[in-house]
Structure formats: structure tokens, C-alpha cells
Swiss-Prot record:
Protein's recorded name: mRNA-capping enzyme regulatory subunit OPG124
Subunit structure: Interacts with the catalytic subunit OPG113.
Main location: virion
Function, as annotated: Regulatory subunit of the mRNA cap enzyme which stabilizes the catalytic subunit and enhances its methyltransferase activity through an allosteric mechanism. Heterodimeric mRNA capping enzyme catalyzes the linkage of a N7-methyl-guanosine moiety to the first transcribed nucleotide (cap 0 structure), whereas the methyltransferase OPG102 is responsible for a second methylation at the 2'-O position of the ribose (cap 1 structure). Also involved in early viral gene transcription termination and intermediate viral gene transcription initiation.
Organism of derivation: Vaccinia virus (strain Copenhagen)
InterPro entries with a match to the protein in the record: Poxvirus_mRNA-cap_ssu, Poxvirus_mRNA-cap_ssu_sf
Coiled coil: none
GO molecular function: mRNA 5'-cap (guanine-N7-)-methyltransferase activity
Length: 287
């Protein structure tokens, strides 16, 4: 428990290994790989609590998270730490210290207003911006279309779950020699978003990757039609890399399970009020 609290209050990170050789690429747009246990068993424990929250009416979610949904300022914090003075979003600037893509639903918890759902058997979709592997779209590679000679490539990932995000990180670990994942204090600890910071580009591998992508998409520039789910590797990445990734993501999901459990206990408290011991513990933890 002490380690969970420490990660929430101080953040957590991991440095991923560099691979000189790209894995065999086979880009297919339109569908994500399905989840499986080898890509994170903790998710399947954590998703049970997410489903409990997903059943709650959104007006109640807003009430109980109003004071703990602080503005997500993790990207700004990363810019400050790395002394990044200018960033390039989707080609909007010709010269910058970093090229950036934010795939997260910044400062949002749910997708649409909704009443309560009776039981998990009646859940037909994940209405929360939490643990949704379908949120990872091919936009995660969009900065590479705009990358010239920037020092950093920075991605705000919408989730850490699923094969898609691990395959993506494995590719980035051949495109850049330094790839780090961060879950900052100033990110939302209600959601499984995180930041990837990559630097020291491997030009040879980047050229090979972009050649494959452009041949599949039949375009040398980014097209919005590519903003869809995708798969990119036929074969699973090696177990060593998966375990290194899970070393980071498990810390995040353990923390989320604790936070979500407190929130659910607060929302279902006998007091029938936001003034209860679970909410007080939650506020103390996150503020």
C-alpha cells in the first residue's frame, strides 16, 4: 500500500530498452488486436472496478469526482523539466524542440451523459476514458510524419492496456534510442493515460518504418482517414520487452484499482452523501 501511495504522490517511470532492428511490420488499419492475459493480467482485475464505475450515472460521477479531477498538466510539466520552449502539434509549426501528439481525453472522465446501468450484464460499451484499448489509434504515429530534426517526440497515450500499445512502444524503441514512459503526479490518477518521451532518433529505422507506412497508406503525408484503430505486428514481441513494459503499467493499474475502489465505496456509502470516510481518504490521497 505504501508503494501505491508513493507512486501516486511522486509519479512513476521506466526507461525502455533500445533495439537496433525493427520487428517485422504489417500495418493494417481499422481494427485493434484483442486483449489477452499475456499483455497484462492486472488489467482484468482492474477492469472489474472500472465496470462498477461505468454502471454509475454520470451526474453522480461528476459530483463525486468534481474536487479530485484536477487539470491534467503533465505535458506542461514534462516541457518544463526538459526545457522545451516550443512544440509542434500536427505540423502547425515548422520549427520546434519537440513534436507532440495528445491522444488522451484531456480533463475528461466519460464520453457522454448517461443514466445508471442495472448490472454488468447490461453494459454494452465502456463510457469511461479509462482502460479502453480502442482509444489507441494510428494517430500514435502521426508525429513521425512531421518529425524533422526535433530533439524529442512526445506522445500522451490514452491507455496502457492491450497488445496495441505494447507493439507501438516496441516499434518506438527501434525508432529512438531513448524511450521513457512516465505517469506524472500531475496526470489524472483516475485514468490509465501516460506519456512517452523519445529522443535520439535512429534515422535508418525511421526511414524504413515510414517507407512501410507510406506504402500501406498510399500517401507520403498524413491523412485524417488514418485516425482509426490499427494493428502493426503479426508476431508478438519478445517476453522480455513485455515484462519491462508491465513493470511500469502494473504500478499504474495497481494504483488505479486502489483509487477506483475508494471512489466506488464512496459512491455506494451508507451515508448517501459525498461526506463520507472513503471520499475523505480519496481527497487526501489525490489532492
Amino acid at each position: 500500500m505504501d508503494e501505491i501511495v508513493k507512486n501516486i504522490r511522486e509519479g512513476t517511470h521506466v526507461l525502455l530498452p533500445f533495439y537496433e532492428t525493427l520487428p517485422e511490420l504489417n500495418l493494417s488499419l481499422g481494427k485493434s488486436p484483442l486483449p489477452s492475459l499475456e499483455y497484462g493480467a492486472n488489467y482484468f482485475l482492474q477492469i472489474s472496478r472500472v465496470n462498477d464505475l461505468n454502471r454509475m450515472p454520470t451526474d453522480m460521477l461528476k459530483l463525486f469526482t468534481h474536487d479530485i479531477m484536477l487539470p491534467e498538466s503533465d505535458l506542461d510539466k514534462v516541457y518544463e523539466i526538459l526545457k522545451i520552449n516550443s512544440v509542434k502539434y500536427y505540423g502547425r509549426s515548422t520549427k520546434a524542440d519537440a513534436v507532440v501528439a495528445d491522444l488522451s481525453a484531456r480533463n475528461k472522465l466519460f464520453k457522454r451523459e448517461r443514466d445508471a446501468i442495472k448490472s454488468n450484464n447490461h453494459l454494452t460499451e465502456n463510457n469511461l476514458y479509462i482502460s479502453d484499448y480502442k482509444m489507441l489509434t494510428f494517430d500514435v504515429f502521426r508525429p513521425l510524419f512531421d518529425f524533422v530534426n526535433e530533439k524529442y517526440c512526445i506522445i500522451k497515450l490514452p491507455t496502457l492496456f492491450g497488445r496495441g500499445v505494447i507493439d507501438t512502444m516496441r516499434i518506438y524503441c527501434s525508432l529512438f534510442k531513448n524511450v521513457r514512459l512516465l505517469k506524472c503526479v500531475s496526470d489524472s490518477w483516475l485514468k490509465d493515460s501516460a506519456i512517452m518521451v523519445a529522443s535520439d532518433v535512429c534515422k535508418k529505422n525511421l526511414d524504413l518504418f515510414m517507407s512501410h507506412v507510406k506504402s500501406v497508406t498510399k500517401s507520403s503525408s498524413w491523412k485524417d482517414v488514418n485516425s482509426v484503430q490499427f494493428s502493426i505486428l503479426n508476431d508478438p514481441v519478445d517476453t522480455e520487452f513485455i515484462n519491462k513494459f508491465l513493470e511500469f503499467s502494473n504500478r499504474v493499474y495497481e494504483a488505479l484499482y486502489y483509487v477506483h475502489s475508494l471512489l466506488y465505496s464512496s459512491m455506494t456509502s451508507d451515508s448517501k452523501s459525498i461526506e463520507n470516510k472513503h471520499q475523505r481518504r480519496l481527497v487526501k490521497l489525490l489532492l
